Amino acid sequence: MIIPWKELETETLNSLIESFVLREGTDYGEHERSLEQKVEDVRRQLKNGEVLLVWSELHETINIMPRGQFRAGQEEI
């Protein structure tokens, strides 16, 4: 289920994004990026519609995933 991120309190959204960024541990290449930079990257992707905030009823977790990946998962159900 897609969570309408614009309806969340700012602090709640920030916490969700930070949790996601810390969980992902993505390698950014030669230049390490700060937590703040990574959070802003994810926030920009949410605003642009590139990624979605998604609730998994099966796992009872919230995740951030690319829009295309969410749609592909829906087609498999």
Curated annotation (Swiss-Prot):
Q: Which residues form the signal peptide?
A: none
Against InterPro entries, the record matches this protein to: UPF0270, YehU-like_sf
Superkingdom of the organism of origin: Bacteria
What Gene3D superfamilies does the database record attribute to this sequence? Answer: YehU-like (1.10.10.610)
**Family named by the database record:** Belongs to the UPF0270 family.
Q: Which NCBIfam families match?
A: PRK04966.1 (NF003438)
This chain belongs to the protein called: UPF0270 protein Spro_4577
The source organism is Serratia proteamaculans (strain 568)
